[in-house]
Amino acid sequence: MAVYKEAYPVDILEDDAEGYQAAAEAYYEMLREGAQTSAEVISLSTGEQVRLETSSLCFCTIYRDEPQHKILGLVNPQDTKTVVAVYLKESWWSIEDILRTSDPTREGLMKVQSFGERIVLFVLNVIVFGRLERRLHIDDMFFLPHPAKEQAKILWKDGAAVAFYSVKMKGSLCGDGTGTCYLLPVLDTVFVRRKNRCQGLGTAMLRDFCDTFQGDEALGISCPISPAMYRVLRQFLLTCPGERGRLWEVEPPGAWGQQRVNIWLKVYLQERRLQDGSTVHPKCSEEDTDTPGQASQEDGPTQFNHGESHKEWAVGEPERTQNGRRCAQVCEEARQV
């Protein structure tokens, strides 16, 4: 393994999740039994100091489908739902340090493979996306960890993990208890950190997703899609018109009919409504990219509710809808734009 001047967890962690968990449990028991002569203190980025006591520690589930795998986290005493540091390799690491790397070759979009990369994905998704950078006054949801074998890529930039996206593979189980499988690859979660938005990273991940599955005629985006993500999709499809017929907003398993809506068609119809003055266009940033694919309003691993999608115009193949002629006409107009 390469040795770096200042290594971070993703650079040095071996694929030994059980070993790290056992060490964390032993450390926790030591604190609980008061084996240390004096309590350790960790300084937060805010300047606040937190004493390492069992009341400030919690074990966090790393994988949604394997709840036995956990890591030890230190919570903010002012907000006990927010983890501010994680115990790994017999040391405490701040959230920002977990997202850093000293490996110069770790740049751009890279597939999540190692245990260290799974930890980075967990921190980005559950801690940063789910707590630190969400709009608390708008959204009461928190975000569930990805499954252990979830296909995902992390976008590394200037020595830090700044974005990620995850994919439900064609043929993988939908996870709804019915045994049904996805009928197409589906982009499930997308996130760009606030300080890295408006830099084209969202469209770059969409392009990578489409390029990765070039052999598939149809690709899905998990429903519901946020207005911010729709703006990113609009920009992407304006730049890459060849992808307009491939991208669909889908509900599992993504069958034709009431489970697929063509994204470009929805964009086109929205703009027609704007031209008619029937819809107020929200003024927002170009790339406020966050699409929660796994969210819950209650504690514990609950099934993701895909929400409501408006399908009154076009769902799946136009000729199969009740308003077939009208929808087919609009589809043809959208293709020509």
From Swiss-Prot:
Polar residues bias locations: 291-306
Q: Where is this region: Disordered?
A: 278-326
Positions with biased composition (Basic and acidic residues): 307-322
Instruction: Read off the InterPro entries from this record.
Output: FAM169 (IPR029625)
Query: What family is reported?
Result: Belongs to the FAM169 family.
Q: What is this protein called?
A: Protein FAM169B
* Source species of the chain: Mus musculus (Mouse)
